[in-house]
């Protein structure tokens, strides 16, 4: 039986490519996106495939997935400083409440979870690209 993976932010740039990769590797993929910044055009080629299902859902609301679940890849989040200014509350909620909901789902399903971050945590970096040990150049008071 194929492993099942939930990919949040599935209609975004990274999420859609992850859906493609996991399907190509024989996984049963459950894509989830609220489509605030994601676009169905990124995953429409997957509709109708036996090993793909899409849930139009906001992870800041309770998340229920029936059956077994092996992995959760949490990539849901507005991904641009422009979006952060336009929808600041939603951005904060998906990173906090959305992560909380998905951690609860991972616990319920005994699934492994990967939570994506963003280069924005480095602030305005002094070096490019940033290595894993780069401390960042973040102004803690804004």
Each language-model region and where it sits:
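N-terminal Rossmann-like NAD(P)+-binding domain of SDR-like oxidoreductases, especially those catalyzing
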Residues: 1-142
